[in-house]
């Protein structure tokens, strides 16, 4: 599932979903592209088995980097799965990573930009970083409402704000 649905700006209650999925044998995999870097997603506490993110959106960089984090339960599935791999194989990538390498060309400028972003977040402190994102989201929502606009989502995310156009809007 998604932590935040981009087109609607909706925040999903991943913590509650994680509790439900944890009572089954299913893996709980979360698309965190719009969430990671924008608000807390504690994998262990929320019973998340796999968290996938990218450098765009929540991490505040251009597209080009992917991040994957797995629980031990998820890694066990990855390492024992018998399904064929056609392009990307996490087992091969893990082996390369253990040797300090990657299977594909590393976009060095994006890695350096990531270092800059992470250093800045570390300087500020994670709680303060998330607080600042919440402050900006609250301000954006406040200003939209002050302009007579309404939010699209009843459960808005702090990472993206979707605003409904007025019914009489003409254009685009």
State where each predicted segment sits.
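Conserved active-site segment immediately N-terminal to the catalytic lysine
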Residues: 44-56
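Active-site C-terminal subdomain of aminotransferase-like
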Residues: 56-142
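Conserved PLP-binding catalytic core of the aspartate aminotransferase-like
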Residues: 150-172
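Fold-independent oxyanion-binding glycine-rich loops
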Residues: 2-5, 30-33, 39, 54-56, ...
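Active-site phosphate-binding strand-loop segment of PLP-dependent enzymes
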Residues: 1-33, 50
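Short, well-ordered, mixed-charge alpha-helical segments that flank or form enzyme active sites
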Residues: 6-11, 36-40, 45, 59-62, ...
